[in-house]
C-alpha cells in the first residue's frame, strides 16, 4: 500500500513549512512558520486544516515557542500560550489531545525540575512522533477498510465529503486515504466529491488530490448527493471526523449529517474513517461537542478566499443582499444511529455503540 507523495507539513532547519491550502488548486506555495503565533494564524485562517494536520501543526507550534526562549516562562505564562493555541480551532479534539500530551510530559507538579533544554528537546520529539504516528495510523486504518469491499477488483462508486486526504493529515489521509488504498488494491473507482460549501474544501482540495492521483471523479454540489444515490448504485459514503463522542456521535464538516440521512434512506453504507486521536470518551454524546462558528462573509461573498498576500483569489463579489445575516457553523454532528461503521487503526467498529467503541479502544 503506497502513501501519497504529497507532504503538506515539513519540519526543516527548526522551522515549520506548510503547504498553503488557501491558494489551492490555482497555486502551490508554502509558508514558513517561525513562531507559535505563526502556527495559530495558520490554523485559524486555514492555511492548514483537517483535525490531524491541525494537531501536528499545534505540536510544532509549541516546539517553536520553546525554541524561541532563552529562559523558562512561569507555568501560568505557559498555560496562557497553550490556551491561545487551543482556541484557534475548538471543535476537533486532536489539537486538545496534542496539548494535553505535552502538558502530561511536563506537568505543573514538577515543572521546575525540567531545564529549558529538556523541554525544548521533548517538545520537538513529541511533534515529530505525532507526524510519523499519524501517517502510520492512516495506512493501518486503510488496510482494515479493504475488508469492507470485495476482495476481487471491482467497480466501486463512492461519495465523500470535505477533504480527508494527504492535505488534512501527515500525508496519506483518512477517508480519502481509504479511497486511495482501494485504488491501489486494484478496484476501479468513481468518486463523487461534494464541493463542501462554504469553504469549498471538496472543490478546491479533494478534487485536486483526486486529479493528482488520477482517480476518476466527479465534483458535485452538496445538495446533489440524493440525486446521485437515486440515479446510480453507490457502494459507500466515506467521510472523516473531527471528534467522536463516547456513543459514536460524530462531528465532521458541515453537511455530513444530511449526507448520512440521505445515505440511510437509500440503503447506502455510511462509514467514518478516523484515528483514535479523534475519539473523546470524556463526552457522552454529540450534544457536548462545541461547534465552531465562522465568519458570515464565507456565506455571503466570495472575497473570503485570499492568497498569501491577502488578495482575493476570486473576483470580489457579493452573493447575498447587503445586510443579510448568515449562519456559518463549520461542523455538524451525525448521530451514531446513521453510521454503519467507524474505520480506525484499531479495527472497524460496527455497529457503532459506546460498548463497541470502548472495546476496541480499551487501551486509550
Curated annotation (Swiss-Prot):
Pathway: Amino-acid biosynthesis; L-methionine biosynthesis via salvage pathway; L-methionine from S-methyl-5-thio-alpha-D-ribose 1-phosphate: step 1/6. GO terms for biological process: L-methionine salvage from methylthioadenosine. InterPro entries: IF-2B-related, IF-M1Pi, IF_2B-like_C, Initiation_fac_2B_a/b/d, M1Pi_N, NagB/RpiA_transferase-like. Transmembrane segments: none annotated. The record marks 162 as: Transition state stabilizer. The active site is at residue 242. Keywords: Amino-acid biosynthesis, Isomerase, Methionine biosynthesis. Substrate binds at residues 49-51, 89, 201, 252-253. Pfam families: IF-2B (PF01008). It comes from the Bacteria. GO terms for molecular function: S-methyl-5-thioribose-1-phosphate isomerase activity. Its EC number is 5.3.1.23. It catalyses: 5-(methylsulfanyl)-alpha-D-ribose 1-phosphate = 5-(methylsulfanyl)-D-ribulose 1-phosphate. HAMAP family: Salvage_MtnA. Catalyzes the interconversion of methylthioribose-1-phosphate (MTR-1-P) into methylthioribulose-1-phosphate (MTRu-1-P). Belongs to the eIF-2B alpha/beta/delta subunits family. MtnA subfamily. PANTHER family: METHYLTHIORIBOSE-1-PHOSPHATE ISOMERASE. NCBIfam families: eIF-2B_rel (TIGR00524), PRK05720.1 (NF004326), salvage_mtnA (TIGR00512). This is Methylthioribose-1-phosphate isomerase. It comes from Leptospira interrogans serogroup Icterohaemorrhagiae serovar copenhageni (strain Fiocruz L1-130).
Amino acid at each position: 500500500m503506497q502513501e501519497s507523495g504529497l507532504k503538506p507539513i515539513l519540519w526543516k532547519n527548526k522551522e515549520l513549512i506548510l503547504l498553503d491550502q488557501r491558494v489551492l488548486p490555482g497555486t502551490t506555495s508554502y509558508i514558513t512558520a517561525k513562531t507559535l503565533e505563526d502556527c495559530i494564524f495558520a490554523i485559524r485562517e486555514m492555511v492548514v486544516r483537517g483535525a490531524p494536520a491541525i494537531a501536528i501543526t499545534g505540536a510544532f507550534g509549541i516546539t517553536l515557542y520553546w525554541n524561541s526562549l532563552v529562559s523558562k516562562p512561569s507555568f501560568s505564562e505557559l498555560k496562557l500560550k497553550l490556551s491561545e493555541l487551543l482556541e484557534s480551532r475548538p471543535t476537533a479534539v486532536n489539537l486538545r489531545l496534542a496539548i494535553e500530551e505535552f502538558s502530561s510530559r511536563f506537568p505543573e507538579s514538577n515543572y521546575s525540575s525540567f531545564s529549558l533544554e529538556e523541554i525544548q528537546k521533548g517538545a520537538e520529539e513529541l511533534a515529530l512522533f505525532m507526524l510519523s504516528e499519524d501517517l502510520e495510523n492512516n495506512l493501518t486504518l486503510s488496510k482494515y477498510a479493504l475488508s469492507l469491499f470485495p476482495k476481487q477488483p471491482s467497480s466501486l462508486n463512492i461519495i465523500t465529503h470535505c477533504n480527508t486526504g494527504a492535505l488534512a493529515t501527515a500525508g496519506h489521509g483518512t477517508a480519502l486515504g481509504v479511497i486511495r488504498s482501494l485504488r491501489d488494491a486494484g478496484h476501479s473507482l468513481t468518486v463523487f466529491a461534494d464541493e463542501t460549501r462554504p469553504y469549498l474544501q471538496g472543490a478546491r482540495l479533494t478534487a485536486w488530490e483526486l486529479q493528482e492521483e488520477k482517480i476518476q471523479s466527479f465534483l458535485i454540489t452538496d445538495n446533489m448527493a440524493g440525486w446521485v444515490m437515486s440515479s446510480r448504485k453507490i457502494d459507500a459514503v466515506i467521510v472523516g471526523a473531527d471528534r467522536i463522542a463516547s456513543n459514536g456521535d460524530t462531528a465532521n464538516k458541515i453537511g455530513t449529517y444530511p449526507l448520512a440521512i440521505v445515505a440511510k434512506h437509500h440503503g447506502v453504507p455510511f462509514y467514518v474513517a478516523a484515528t483514535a486521536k479523534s475519539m473523546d470518551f470524556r463526552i457522552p454524546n454529540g450534544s457536548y461537542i462545541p461547534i465552531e462558528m465562522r465568519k458570515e462573509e464565507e456565506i455571503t461573498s466570495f472575497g473570503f478566499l485570499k492568497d498569501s498576500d491577502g488578495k482575493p483569489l476570486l473576483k470580489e463579489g457579493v452573493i447575498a443582499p447587503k445586510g443579510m445575516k448568515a449562519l456559518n457553523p463549520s461542523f455538524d454532528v451525525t448521530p451514531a444511529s446513521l453510521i454503519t461503521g467507524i474505520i480506525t487503526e484499531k479495527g472497524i467498529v460496527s455497529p457503532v455503540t459506546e460498548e463497541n467503541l470502548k472495546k476496541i479502544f480499551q487501551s486509550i
